[in-house]
Amino acid sequence: MTGHTLVRRKSIGRDKRLVGRSRRQWRDMNLPSYGNSKGTNMDIYRAYFEFIAESPADELMLVKDLVTPLIKTTSISLPFDMSEAVADNCLSLSGMGYYLGVGGCCPTCVSSGDPRLGRNDRAALILAYVQQINNIYHYRIFLASIIVLGDRLRGDARDKDMESILTRIIAIPELFFAYYVLLDSGIKNVKVLFYLDREAGSSEYMMYIVFPGKALHLHYRLIDCMKSACKSYRIIAHVWRTNFLLVIRKEYDRQTDSCDVPAVNAEDVYCKLCDLNIDGELLLEYGKLYSAFDEFLPPR
């Protein structure tokens, strides 16, 4: 192989002293008191890799001794499918870059503490979904988006079309589940937009969760809850203009398991929604958001 120089690995039998020294050096450097001595992170890493080069069989033993991971963040590109994140990954998006972090070692996760997540098992989500008719005002931001979507339609049949849209969106419990988990976590000023997902079917809607501000950090526990709540749905992190968002759309090649979710009477929800006095500023903000996202192409 041209251009490569292969270095022969040293024999363990010929140089056991190096192994012993590396082992002792590695363990000494992981003592709490070592942080104030002249050792540096580079010294620690060098001792570690010298040791495993001589005794790879002991690598697992040393990995178990690790307190802090060697790699704390991983750079990603958008759009990013959250199914590629592992259970302990948090998400950070800002003008400085897009990263997955290790939740237990993320300064933002540690400083903010665990999100105030209540019960988010499937039974609790189904109960909230069924009882939404009794909490219309609590979910007004979710429902206001449907009102604006209906208002964008033209013609005398607009009210009938809005009721039809509401019926179709309400019939997709996973969209409500995703919003409920975010609302339950305490994240404020989140908006949701609904668009037809032609690839998933003529009556299937997808949802964009649009976050406020110029930076976004999602705790790893929140991400885990959302993924668990939206099985058979893709959760994709993206950015459009200056807005960070999550796209919730069905995996159209997979069947959803919603047979355990009771149907919600959309007509009753619509009647209560018509009697609800929703803030005009909220409706205006939604109108601007829909106009801004009309040209957005959702990732496949």
Swiss-Prot record:
The keyword Acyltransferase does not apply. A zinc finger (CCCH-type) spans 90-217. It is found in: Host nucleus inner membrane. GO terms for molecular function: zinc ion binding. GO terms for biological process: viral budding from nuclear membrane. It comes from the Viruses. One of its GO terms (cellular component) is membrane. Belongs to the herpesviridae NEC1 protein family. This is Nuclear egress protein 1. It comes from Gallid herpesvirus 2 (strain Chicken/Md5/ATCC VR-987). The gene is NEC1.
